[in-house]
């Protein structure tokens, strides 16, 4: 049955020579994805964790940091990078743009660590001060990186995040959004950031983000990960809603099912490092919608692989993943 619904029955993607082995003795049959599930990314993370700038540069060779948001994200989320990346910015003229990009991305994540994910009314004055101080450094470094490498899309996408955090004017956000899309009109992370900006908690109107996601998705080629924008828009709607069952509607179930088939479940979808996060977005959205056709296929393809995003919206993310997986 699943073969008829999703394509060639029983056919799985070819084994990835760089895939990290699945951990043994998995609790609930699930496991957190480490370093995007890729041995090359693990080498990058280990070099960065050791403060080895030469090792970081060598490990970055297979990747295009100006376009690969997920690889950049591994460095941005790594505690301690802020302690040594400034020296690379100052001393390595040849690779300064790369160092600036990493520093900018790290300072955004580091800033949000100071602010926390709490509601704005619960953030202290000191937390706000540190948050803005770190975002100002991020802004400076990302703008310099964008100037040095005009074809890069990742600095502009990260500048959208810092603009949201600093509550910059809408025209600034629009300029950065357009700059990112000029470099890659189908850039998923840019569109996901726009979905976040359009949420009521960030000044948007109810339903605006979902309408935007639908419009964006109409231009997505078959097998393109841009379909995730639909899944994430519905997850954001769930976050904003007071009703836990707000997505449990037939038309939403169908919309998510169609988006999954067109993107991550399509044979043309390319499983690059971190592909598990795309599947986790759909796994969460389909589960919240109580969808029963595509959800089992998505969880099956994941094989228990869990990514914190977007499950961190739940109080016990990994337990929620395991529960939905068990009932899919």
Where are these regions (language model features)?
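C-terminal/domain-terminus segments
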Residues: 162, 274, 278-316
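Intrinsically disordered, low-complexity segments enriched in Gly and acidic/Ser/Thr residues
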Residues: 242-281, 287, 293-294
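Extreme N-terminal leader/anchor segments
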Residues: 1-92, 296-302, 306, 310, ...
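Carboxylate/His-rich catalytic cores and anion/metal-binding grooves
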Residues: 103
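Short coil/linker segments at helix-helix boundaries
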Residues: 62-95, 106-183, 189-222, 227-258, ...
């Amino acid at each position: 049955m699943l073969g008829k619904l999703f394509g060639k029955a029983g056919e799985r993607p070819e084994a990835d020579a760089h895939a990290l082995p699945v951990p043994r003795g998995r609790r609930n049959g699930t496991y957190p994805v480490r370093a995007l599930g890729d041995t090359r990314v693990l080498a990058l993370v280990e070099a960065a964790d050791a403060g080895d700038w030469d090792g970081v540069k060598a490990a970055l060779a297979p990747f295009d940091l100006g376009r690969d948001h997920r690889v950049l994200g591994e460095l941005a989320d790594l505690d301690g990078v802020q302690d040594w990346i400034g020296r690379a910015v100052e001393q390595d003229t040849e690779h300064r743009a790369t160092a600036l990009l990493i520093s900018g991305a790290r300072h955004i994540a580091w800033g949000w660590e100071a602010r926390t994910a709490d509601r704005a009314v619960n953030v202290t004055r000191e937390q706000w001060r540190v948050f803005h101080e770190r975002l100002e450094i991020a802004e400076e470094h990302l703008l310099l990186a964008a100037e040095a490498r005009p074809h890069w899309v990742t600095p502009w996408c990260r500048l959208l995040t810092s603009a949201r955090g600093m509550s910059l004017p809408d025209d600034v956000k629009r300029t950065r959004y357009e700059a990112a899309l000029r470099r890659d009109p189908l850039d998923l992370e840019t569109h996901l950031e726009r979905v976040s900006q359009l949420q009521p908690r960030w000044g948007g109107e109810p339903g605006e983000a979902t309408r935007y996601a639908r419009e964006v998705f109409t231009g997505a080629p078959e097998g393109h990960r841009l379909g995730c924008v639909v899944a994430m828009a519905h997850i954001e709607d769930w976050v904003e809603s007071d009703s836990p069952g707000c997505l449990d509607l037939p038309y939403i179930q169908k919309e998510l099912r169609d988006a999954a088939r067109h993107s991550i479940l399509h044979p043309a979808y390319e499983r690059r490092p971190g592909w598990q996060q795309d599947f986790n977005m759909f796994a969460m959205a389909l589960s919240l919608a109580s969808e029963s056709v595509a959800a089992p296929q998505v969880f099956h393809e994941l094989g228990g692989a869990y990514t914190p995003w977007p499950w961190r919206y739940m109080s016990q993310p990994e337990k929620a993943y395991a529960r939905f997986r068990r009932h899919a």
